[in-house]
Amino acid sequence: MKPSFRNTSPSFRNRSKPYFRNRSKPYFRNRSKPSFRNTSKRFSPNQQSFRKRLSTIRPGEQIDYKNISLINRFISEQGKILSRRTNRLALKQQRLIARAVKQARILCLIPFLSLK
């Protein structure tokens, strides 16, 4: 025997009336609690803002697959491309470094894996 679903009450998703949110009430359920973000970090005018980190690439250096001395600074001992956080590079610089490393690997200027 198959169970009959006709006599059961409709679920909250399949109601006959569409559900409309009351716009006068706030969207969040409990506004009496202080929000986590506001209480954890307060900005004080005396506190110094974050320090701009110095780029590891000098202004005259070109990010290019032929510049092996530059590329080797951003590769681990195993031959992997180091993360942007480790390299302390901007996003655009990290993309250019990754592209240069991949081109240099294909042209056999640097090894794919270094077994040290």
Swiss-Prot record:
Annotated signal peptide: none
Listed name of the protein: Small ribosomal subunit protein bS18c
Basic residues composition-biased segments: 14-34
UniProt entry keywords in alphabetical sequence: Chloroplast, Plastid, Ribonucleoprotein, Ribosomal protein, RNA-binding, rRNA-binding
Biological processes annotated in GO: translation
Region described as Disordered: 1-51
Molecular-function GO terms, alphabetical: small ribosomal subunit rRNA binding; structural constituent of ribosome
Gene3D superfamilies cross-referenced by the UniProt entry: Ribosomal protein S18 (4.10.640.10)
Subunit-level organization: Part of the 30S ribosomal subunit.
Protein family: Belongs to the bacterial ribosomal protein bS18 family.
HAMAP family the UniProt entry points to: Ribosomal_bS18 (MF_00270)
